[in-house]
Amino acid sequence: MSDIISIKDIDLAKKKVFIRCDFNVPQDDFLNITDDRRIRSAIPTIRYCLDNGCSVILASHLGRPKEISSKYSLEPVAKRLARLLDKEIVMAKDVIGEDAKTKAMNLKAGEILLLENLRFEKGETKNDENLAKELASMVQVYINDAFGVCHRAHSSVEAITKFFDEKHKGAGFLLQKEIDFASNLIKHPARPFVAVVGGSKVSGKLQALTNLLPKVDKLIIGGGMAFTFLKALGYDIGNSLLEEELLEEANKILTKGKNLGVKIYLPVDVVAAPACSQDVPMKFVPAQEIPNGWMGLDIGPASVRLFKEVISDAQTIWWNGPMGVFEIDKFSKGSIKMSHYISEGHATSVVGGGDTADVVARAGDADEMTFISTGGGASLELIEGKELPGVKALRSKENE
């Protein structure tokens, strides 16, 4: 999308640069980072700035801290980043306090400073202009490379851009790549274009489904959200997840698909169990005959075969949402198999972030996918056709 100001359009030579990254990475109970994909994704932009003789200030949030706590510190991120870049990272003890400001002022060309968790400042999530002004005062150039938070109007994402003119703000390589992939997917997909949509709730994906229907050739609906559609068709779904208030909307989507000539595929069988737990009995049952007191927790083998057939001739596949409760091993098979089939084909495969990216990583298919988005919510909102606040803030005024 050429109307977004890119990092390449900016004269960075020897400037002090602020890069908003998305280092919101999962950690275990000992605060060890369990997946550093988001950190690795930021490296091309960081290296580009270093190659241009910049001094670099990095900023990110981590989790949703209610107060300042070592549990949410970016210290582990600094260590991992130092290892990945093979370079010392200066760590600030705060965000806009004396320590951060002193270290920012003394930062020399080729050095990197990582600020402490942005959400330790209450103003961050309120899009507070005073916080934004303090952050902006540390640098000459602002780069946003945090696609995962672009759908949020936060201080370090939106308000901060008001303090930089078009020659001094832009999108990093990761953000540009994310926007380009989503834009091409919606505007110029190679056909047949198949969307595979799962996850637990219809409510979270309703707008995306509505926006996708006129653009796709086929739509596969799996995961917990499929049961609202199956119920809308009059099937017995037992105790499976149901959003009763959305039955009418589900019917509308099915009707709209039919009117547009888009084939919509739902599970034909499911893995059912009396409870969502690893140590309960399970059985394969037809999707329309889930026994009372049982719930569907994954797609069954017949559904896996059907969905494999549906995507076999696809040229473009967009996948957002697991096919079952993949966190529990015995209900993860459908999601893992879908990951294998999508990655093995010749289609351009775009994976929406969040849980779907976790499934792909667990299946060992990450390297075979064309593109894995780093942002679940942001990716979904782009597909819904929404303008993301963080992206809008980087548009060139000439193109508005």
Curated annotation (Swiss-Prot):
Protein known as: Phosphoglycerate kinase
Reactions catalysed: (2R)-3-phosphoglycerate + ATP = (2R)-3-phospho-glyceroyl phosphate + ADP
MF-aspect GO terms: ADP binding; ATP binding; phosphoglycerate kinase activity
Gene3D superfamilies from the UniProt entry: Phosphoglycerate kinase, N-terminal domain (3.40.50.1260)
Origin species: Campylobacter jejuni subsp. jejuni serotype O:2 (strain ATCC 700819 / NCTC 11168)
Annotated ATP binding sites: 205, 296, 327, 353-356
Subunit structure: Monomer.
Record's keyword annotation contains Membrane: no
Positions with a binding annotation for substrate: 22-24, 38, 61-64, 119, 152
